[in-house]
Amino acid sequence: MSPLTPNPFYNLYTEDNLKKPIPNTMLRVAMSVLAVMILWPMAPGARSWAGELVPIPLPPPQTDGGKPLMQALGLRATSRAFAPDPIPAQTLSNLLWAAWGINRPADGKRTAPSARNWQEIDLMVVRADGTFHYDAAANRLRPVAAGDHRALTGVQPFVKDAPLTLLLVADTSRMKGAEKDPDQRQWIWADAGFISQNIYLFCASEGLATGVRALVDRPALAKALGLKEHQIILLSQSVGRPVASIPDNPNKK
């Protein structure tokens, strides 16, 4: 706008105008815009207005139902093919609780055992919209890193197809006393195995496909997620809907 061009907003800010009440229409529009900005629900993995990942609250886990234990054991299997369909929030909440949730709130103990109750295993959720840490106490996902890092969670091609991979990471800084006895570090593998089996049994009960692996590009994945030296990637386990089986060709000889 040149100096000679009249400013269309000049007269709005005169002393007289500032004393006038705001027209009802303008007030309603302003309040509506503000309400939308505050209350608009963000989709899982959505970014904040500043462009950063935000914590994702999970629905309360449903801890009843499911198949009988012996039936789930009979259905437990490893899969290497996954449909790309996203896992619903309720199913994800149930899965995470079954894997490593708090089943005794009074003392914070979990659904899987932990040597000396170190609770040194962190369960991370790797998805297309980012990587998140399962905060069992708050029942939410805390952002770890933006971006799709599923391809780094294994060396097989299928790892990038599953809608999510659960990453089991040991935080050795919680293992008080283990620094005096290095053999106690071996417990991290047992503790991770307990959680992995919980994941298997939940998936068997819910008709989901899952597969665990230890073959992971640990240095690349740790760098991508910004992990510290005391955080050790142990296992990764993909979860998703099973791929529908293709019926045999009746004309096949």
Give residue spans per PLM region.
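Signal peptide processing junction and immediate N-terminal pro/mature segment
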Residues: 42-50
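N-terminal secretory signal peptides that target proteins for export/translocation
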Residues: 1-26
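Short, electropositive alpha-helical surface patch
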Residues: 220-236
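N-terminal amphipathic, basic helical "cap/leader" segment at the start of enzyme domains
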Residues: 5-11, 49-162, 247-248
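Small-aliphatic-rich amphipathic alpha-helix that forms the alpha element of a beta-alpha
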Residues: 76, 95, 123, 164-175, ...
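C-terminal helix-cap and adjacent tail motif
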Residues: 60-62, 232-253
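Bacterial N-terminal signal peptides
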Residues: 29-42
